[in-house]
């Protein structure tokens, strides 16, 4: 953080140095709180299958942040005040986790064995460092090699895809502990069957969310940036690439949740670092001639590389099943993407919403059609899995009715 405060004002001098440093420090506070107060208790709640507590607090923080920021902007508050409010909203989560675990669950820290050692802790740390590099590559490369207008365009689209990623990624919450428990009990057959059904549900949910995003993101940005003329915010090719990259980045959670649940950090360390290296190298090389599209291509290739590697590792090493059972999902995903992109290219759905209300109506129609399309294709390609999932859901519903 100290390096960023010193170096960034030298790279970008569009604002006063004091303002730049102040904003960096304000934005860093929520991250510091998350890692120094919240991360340990977050992981504990996840391992204890109480991640719903984190989800509820997170939802509250998001809503509170939106209301607070909108109010301050409406009142004409400065960017510094708005960012302080944003930080305050998000430090609620780690502070709540800290007190919830320590008070409500009443952990006795005196019973902790002094000579206990966490295996692979440095490999886990190494993967996190690679993750931080990877998720910040796009912004850093664009900041260093392009102008502020380009970064602003990226930020708008990234705002949408990040929100979508969090919605879909929520379906992996708690799966680590479930898979880890099955693996520890050596219930390989149950683990393999459960994971297959989980793949089906996760890919179905992901495509039901991401296909509408592919169609709706440009109309949303057009409405969101109406009247703003500092940059060309309508970037359809970049939008498509960024959405597909985020889709691949999100779907890897299916396999990373399995890999990390069995503690295979060291075995997958190289894959994670290669992803970061591919992303950085391709983004830097391509940004000169392609700008936004260049960094999107770099991120997409890197995410696809890691997704395939994690697919292969989880299938061959952990589940000990045919790799094609996972790999065929890529063919299904690409088929669905191509169909939607062709629909967009030939303007088959020729409707342009003009405000948020008409956009919401349009989004509802697109969501319904996408849901029908995704379920039809996924069931057609995975009939046996679909049947197992249906029986599982039916059993759960029937059980709840009985009780």
Model-derived features with residue positions:
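Interhelical loop/hinge segments that connect adjacent transmembrane helices in multipass membrane
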Residues: 79-80, 95-136, 140, 174, ...
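Alpha-helical transmembrane segments of polytopic membrane transporters and translocases
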Residues: 30, 85, 91, 122, ...
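Interfacial segments at transmembrane-helix termini and the short loops linking adjacent helices
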Residues: 6-27, 216-246, 354-357
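Helix-loop junctions and terminal segments of transmembrane helices
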Residues: 46-47, 161-199, 255-261
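Hydrophobic alpha-helical transmembrane segments
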Residues: 56-103, 118-120, 127, 158-161, ...
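Interfacial/gating helices of multi-pass transporter permease domains
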Residues: 20, 79-80, 116-120, 124, ...
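Membrane-proximal transmembrane or re-entrant/amphipathic helices at the cytosolic face
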Residues: 344-403
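Membrane-interface junctions at transmembrane-helix termini in multi-pass inner-membrane proteins
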Residues: 33-56, 80, 101, 105, ...
